[in-house]
Regions:
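Gly/Pro-rich hinge or "lid" segments in bacterial periplasmic/extracellular proteins
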Residues: 189-241, 245
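Short, low-complexity disordered leader/linker segments with a strong preference
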Residues: 1-59, 100, 145, 166
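Local pocket/hinge segments that shape ligand/substrate recognition
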Residues: 236, 270-344
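Surface-exposed binding/hinge segments that line
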Residues: 110, 114, 155-201
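N-terminal lobe/hinge region of extracytoplasmic solute-binding protein
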Residues: 62-111, 212-213
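Aromatic- and charge-enriched surface segment that lines or borders ligand/interaction sites
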Residues: 107-152, 308-309
Length: 344
């Protein structure tokens, strides 16, 4: 599986804000949503609420751009990943670093013996960044929006929750009852996919660049394709938000991100996959490198032509390969771990 790296520049160990951002990103908590009070419409234009001040805590974050930076969870699969990665959306449940399911917006759930009826209890007192309460009806509305819009895009939400499922919301009890036509071994796990992030559908005007969610940051402005976003702290978030403002800057390749970090243009970058750059940062006390195992797999392919057209020879080569040595070679640099098949 492919590793994910986050790099930050240290300043003599004195910067509190830079010490917090890595944990924030690894937890998938860095959220972005839009505008003020409940009932106001989402926007991608600058908000007057984010005035710079001398004591403002600002993070400059260099990252890759996917699908023109869209945060539309229903329209594009990358949109869901962007929204959660930037911190716009959260899901009912999430997977921790050990790939164990744990509550996020939900408090708990129960399921019947047939695994066709799930009752989810929401945490109390949660709000969207526009001030609206997170209710069972709001969650139902978000899922119905995915059902309505999903077929016209690439997000394919039906992979995680069938369109035949019925959803009943009880706002007084704070519960959501989901009934499916077929058994789901782990529906809560599937609802943890970024595509299933909970959005305030009613008050979001611009789903592509102004989605309203429940996380610690909200979109102050979308600065353009290839440029990035300006994010500000969500005043309605349930916990303390480490930064007042995050400048999310799109950077085209690994080298650009590495150079931006070295020059001080940014404080944090992600997914540096050049082994030489990673080693350079790891060897310096000025930077912190955090590497976590991802869920993406890489493959090496054999040419079936010529000598390797012999199946027995290919099998012999596969049996002789030392996968640990390859994964830890100078070329791979430990960014991959040896995989295996569930089949014998």
């Amino acid at each position: 599986c492919e590793g994910t790296e986050q790099l930050q520049q240290n300043t003599g160990g004195k910067s509190v804000k830079k010490g917090k951002i890595l944990a924030l990103l690894l937890a998938g908590v860095m959220a972005t949503t839009v505008l003020g009070g409940c009932g106001s419409k989402g926007s991608d234009s600058s908000s007057s609420s984010s005035k710079a001040s001398s004591d403002e805590k600002v993070l400059n974050f260099g990252c890759a751009m996917y699908t023109d930076g869209s945060v539309n969870t229903a329209g594009d699969e990358n949109g869901g990943w962007n929204a959660m990665r930037y911190g716009i959306t959260e899901t009912l449940f999430k997977f921790n670093d050990n790939m164990e399911l744990e509550p996020w917006l939900a408090e708990s759930y129960t399921v019947n013996d047939d695994h066709t009826e799930w009752v989810v209890t929401l945490k109390k007192g949660l709000k969207f960044s526009d001030g609206c309460d997170l209710t069972a009806s709001k969650v139902k509305e978000a899922y119905e929006h995915l059902k309505e819009v999903g077929p016209s895009g690439s997000a394919k939400p039906e992979k995680y929750l069938e369109f035949e499922a019925t959803i009943d919301a009880d706002d007084e009890a704070g519960t959501l009852t989901i009934k499916t036509s077929q058994p789901y071994a782990n529906l809560m796990g599937q609802l943890s996919h970024p595509t299933m992030g909970i959005v305030d559908v009613e008050h979001t005007e611009n789903f592509d660049n102004g989605t309203i969610g429940t996380g610690p940051y909200m979109i102050d402005s979308f600065n353009g394709v290839g440029v990035g976003y300006t994010l500000v702290a969500n005043p309605n978030f349930r916990e303390e938000v480490p930064y007042d403002k995050v400048n999310l800057l799109y950077m085209g390749d690994n080298s650009a991100k590495a150079m931006a970090l070295e020059s001080g243009q940014v404080d944090l970058v992600e997914n540096i996959t050049n082994v030489a750059d990673i080693q350079k940062f790891q060897d310096s006390d000025d930077y912190t490198v955090d590497i976590a195992t991802g869920v993406r797999c890489g493959f090496s392919w054999m040419n079936f032509d010529g000598v390797l057209g012999n199946k027995t020879l290919r099998q012999a080569i596969l049996m002789a390969i030392d996968y640990d040595t390859i994964c830890n070679s100078k070329t791979i640099g430990g960014l991959y771990t040896p995989g295996f098949s569930v089949l014998p």
